[in-house]
């Protein structure tokens, strides 16, 4: 429903602009951007390719320092991404929580005591949280060991993805 997407987009943009962690940031509507700007957002990992290629009613709120981005109407209504250097997942989680808490002051999430947070994509239901790291592994990529490492990590419940996320190939030994 195009009107529903537009309403969600406008509400989220307005609500996110009041979140302290995003202060000074920019809300970008995909419909208003030229293709090269969309490509830059994807290259900087601030928006997914799916969001950039989608049409009406989608956008992204980017913090001033580009350490946080919130995609609106991508796979789910909101996708909060935070970035930190040096495998500092705790700092990234604190930033994501600050955005989430700020947004939740003015919005109500769909929540079930049985299933957790209800999302448009059923595989994201529950906490909706996924932690990811990007690593440069040139020695493993050049050796015959990378396939073994991927299989071993898979047995531990860890997914290895390409540089652009799910379903993408790695390039330059980035995983």
Residue spans of the language-model regions?
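Phosphate-binding loop of NTP-binding sites
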Residues: 138
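Conserved phosphate/anionic-ligand binding catalytic regions in large, soluble enzymes, centered on
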Residues: 116-135
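Long, Pro/Ser/Thr-rich low-complexity/intrinsically disordered regulatory tracts in eukaryotic proteins
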Residues: 1-114, 129, 141-143, 147-175
């Amino acid at each position: 429903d195009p009107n529903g997407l537009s309403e969600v987009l406008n509400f989220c943009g307005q609500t996110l602009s009041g979140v302290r962690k995003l202060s000074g940031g920019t809300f970008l509507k995909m419909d208003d951007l030229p293709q090269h700007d969309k490509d830059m957002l994807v290259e900087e990992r601030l928006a997914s390719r799916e969001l950039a290629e989608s049409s009406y009613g989608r956008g992204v709120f980017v913090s001033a320092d580009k350490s946080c981005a919130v995609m609106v109407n991508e796979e789910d209504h909101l996708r909060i991404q935070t970035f930190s250097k040096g495998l500092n997942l705790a700092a990234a989680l604190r930033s994501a929580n600050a955005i989430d808490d700020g947004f939740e002051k003015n919005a109500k999430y769909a929540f079930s005591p049985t299933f957790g947070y209800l999302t448009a994509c059923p595989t994201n239901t529950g906490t909706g949280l996924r932690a990811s790291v990007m690593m440069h592994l040139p020695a493993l990529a050049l050796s015959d060991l990378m396939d073994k490492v991927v299989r071993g990590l898979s047995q531990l419940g860890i997914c290895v993805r390409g540089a652009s996320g799910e379903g993408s190939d790695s390039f330059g030994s980035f995983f």
